[in-house]
């Protein structure tokens, strides 16, 4: 009755006006419906529609990655000790632990790529023009644990970026097939054209990245920087935050590069040979080419496109590459030394003032067991709340607040078999920040 009275007031009694009145009502109704309608498939964060809180909420609800267990991720990311303790206790309850997703699961779900991407909640459009205009390249080296790989890919995925995946030749066939099935669902993710068997601490780890470098440079995507990852890495910044950090480098690279200790100098004093493992020989190596000063770091880098091009094409770089092939863990001194070489784009001088620690570089955040301690007594970080493997912390929920205070783009190591709560909370945090631009 009230609606009828309202119509009469708006359109008083003349039949000639009836059509116009109903048209007016239709326009009002249409505008109201459009106000609450969002085309999530074609939305981006800078579109007019996205300024609506309603649309933003709809998008987040369609893409959110909430922790599957009853833990307080917002509290954990803010360092709330009660929330952390509850998460650590929850992680100890074996009956609550979910078995990891299998190769077979991914082989089945990827038969329908659209269903796979929707169900696993991949972001399938650029979230801003700034990100669209600044594509990032990834070299992803993996050998096991298919769910870890898929979750890492989902966390760093953006349709404007480009991803090269290198799978260890020694990996099980079902794992290789599952990786192929996943990447077949994305036009900007591909398998490296040349695969090698990767042996711990040997040259093959570098060769895997070099193979991806060659493929990525041949891609049609005009990427600006290359990041390399392994299966235990995870981003701690959104893609938008990474773009901002990379732009601030202004063409420079960012990677650990320090003076080697005496023990590390032994890594290139003798030749090493590879069978199933790496072992030293009694054959001494010649000094580095052109007496180039050697530096040490780690396997991870943030490298400009020009740096990558010079790694592959510059004759001086190629001489050094050949020289380090029979050293121990060459990935930990090749990149660090090239970063101080004067002919390399984006490098820094070899002077001590330019030494770069892993905490100063933005490439990777790692918590080493022998550096852990009481921060009030000068230790660089508190003890690991997870466990240690090869003296590296596999993070637990108690580490997440500290992790998020750092400027690095990615952190290492994560393993859902050790603590899935920290990974789930990090996923939830990153997805919320990507959509809303704010923390949990």
Curated annotation (Swiss-Prot):
What GO terms describe the biological role, i.e. biological process, of this protein?
protein glycosylation
Which GO molecular function annotation, any one, does this entry have? beta-1,3-galactosyl-O-glycosyl-glycoprotein beta-1,6-N-acetylglucosaminyltransferase activity
Pfam families of this UniProt entry? Branch
What disulfide bonds does the UniProt entry report for this chain?
Answer: 73-230, 164-384, 185-212, 393-425
Q: Which domain of life is it from?
A: Viruses
Name used for this protein in its record: Beta-1,3-galactosyl-O-glycosyl-glycoprotein beta-1,6-N-acetylglucosaminyltransferase
Q: Specify the pathway.
A: Protein modification; protein glycosylation
Described function: Non-essential glycosyltransferase that can synthesize all known mucin beta 6 N-acetylglucosaminides. Mediates core 2 and core 4 O-glycan branching, 2 important steps in mucin-type biosynthesis. Has also I-branching enzyme activity by converting linear into branched poly-N-acetyllactosaminoglycans. Contributes to the post-translational modifications of structural proteins.
What InterPro entries does this protein's entry cite?
Answer: Glyco_trans_14
Query: What is this enzyme's EC?
Result: 2.4.1.102, 2.4.1.148, 2.4.1.150
A GO CC term attached to the entry: membrane
Residues exposed to the Lumenal side: 31-440
User: Which species is this record about?
Assistant: Bovine herpesvirus 4 (strain LVR140) (BoHV-4)
Is the NADP keyword given for this protein?
no
């Amino acid at each position: 009755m009230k609606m009828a009275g309202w119509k009469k007031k708006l359109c008083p009694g003349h039949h000639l006006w009836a059509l116009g009145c109903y048209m007016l009502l239709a326009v009002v109704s249409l505008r109201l419906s459009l106000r609450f309608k969002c085309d999530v498939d074609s939305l981006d964060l800078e579109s007019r529609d996205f300024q609506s809180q309603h649309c933003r909420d709809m998008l987040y609800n369609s893409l959110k990655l909430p922790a599957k267990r009853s833990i307080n991720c917002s509290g954990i990311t803010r360092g709330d000790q009660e929330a952390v303790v509850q998460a650590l206790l929850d992680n100890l309850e074996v009956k609550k632990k979910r078995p990891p997703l299998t190769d077979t699961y991914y082989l089945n779900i990827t038969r329908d790529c659209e269903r796979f991407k929707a169900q696993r909640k991949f972001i399938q459009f650029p979230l801003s023009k700034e990100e669209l205009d600044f594509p990032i390249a990834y070299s992803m080296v993996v050998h096991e644990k298919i769910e870890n790989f898929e979750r890492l890919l989902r966390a760093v995925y953006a349709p404007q970026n480009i991803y090269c995946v290198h799978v260890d030749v020694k990996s099980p066939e079902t794992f290789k097939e599952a990786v192929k099935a996943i990447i077949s669902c994305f036009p900007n993710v591909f398998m490296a054209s040349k695969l090698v068997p990767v042996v711990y601490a040997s040259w093959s780890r570098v060769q895997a990245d070099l193979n991806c470098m060659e493929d990525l440079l041949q891609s049609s995507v005009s990427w600006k920087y290359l990041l390399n990852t392994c299966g235990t890495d995870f981003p701690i910044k959104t893609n938008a935050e990474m773009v901002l950090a990379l732009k601030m480098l202004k063409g420079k690279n960012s990677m650990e590069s320090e003076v080697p200790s005496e023990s590390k100098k032994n890594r290139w004093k003798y030749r090493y040979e590879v069978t199933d493992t790496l072992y030293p020989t009694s054959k001494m190596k010649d000094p580095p080419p052109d007496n180039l000063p050697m530096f040490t770091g780690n396997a991870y880098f943030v490298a400009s496109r020009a740096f990558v091009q010079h790694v592959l094409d510059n004759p001086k770089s190629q001489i050094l590459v050949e020289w380090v092939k029979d050293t121990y863990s060459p990935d930990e001194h090749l990149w660090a030394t090239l970063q101080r070489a004067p002919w390399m784009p984006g490098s820094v001088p070899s002077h001590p003032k330019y030494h770069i620690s892993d905490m100063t570089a933005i490439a990777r955040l790692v918590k080493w067991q022998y550096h852990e301690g009481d921060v009030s007594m000068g230790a660089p970080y508190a003890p690991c709340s997870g466990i240690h493997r090869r003296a590296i912390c596999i993070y637990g929920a108690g580490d997440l607040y500290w992790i998020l205070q750092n400027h690095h783009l990615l952190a290492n190591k994560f393993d859902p078999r050790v603590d899935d709560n920290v990974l789930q909370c990090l996923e939830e945090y990153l997805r919320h920040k990507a959509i809303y631009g704010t923390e949990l």
